[in-house]
Amino acid sequence: KENEPENWKRISLFLTPNQYVAYHLTGEIAIDRTSAGNLGGIFDYERNDWSDEMLELLGIPRSMLPQRIIDPTDILGRLTAEAAAELRLMPGTPVCAGCIDCLASTLSGVYTAGHTVAVLATSLNWGLLHDQRQKNPQYITMPYLTKEHSLRYTYGGISTAGALTKWFAGNLAGGTGVQGYEEREKKLLFRELEQAAAEIPAGSEGLLMLPYFMGERTPIWDSK
């Protein structure tokens, strides 16, 4: 809006990646509660609706957001004939709304209030599943993915976690980068790094790295 005003004028609707795919599959526009809760603090999870106060503060028209907010397990729509033909599936196949990736992974064993969970991938989310109101606005709180609407997930997020293995391989393990590597070469390189890391004692002999390679999210909130 501030840095690319011309592109801002061209925007008609904000959709998260999973809902964008669902739109092309069904022709229906909606958003699940977890995705809505992950959109920069503009979702009021007490009311299960967009926050008019935050939208006004940020200058975002409500019309730019999906008006239908549903649970992840709800049927968003049904497969169109065109999408069904391309995917070789039956037209009318139900398509669920889905949810944010990190919450989907918690279903492997974390679905009770009081449990903590670390989700490690490209980035890292480490948080608590609870049924309390958010007490610290520096952290992110979003609705949990079950139909039990009292459950919430509050977490701190590190932007670069698993992504650092690629940076390390490209800059310190040969200095040639990994972009030009064949897939087989990449696997061999990372396997060698994994074997070498296994020989390092716990604590890395006092070496400490602060993973602020792309700014930081909660609770630091510093883009630099």
Sequence positions of predicted segments:
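A glycine-/small-polar-enriched, mobile loop at the entrance of the PLP active site in fold-type I
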Residues: 37-43, 63-73, 154
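Gly-rich Lys/Arg/Thr-decorated short loops/hinges at beta-loop-alpha junctions or inter-strand turns
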Residues: 31-38, 60-65, 85
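Active-site core segments that coordinate phosphate-bearing ligands/cofactors
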Residues: 1-30, 41-57, 75-77, 81-224
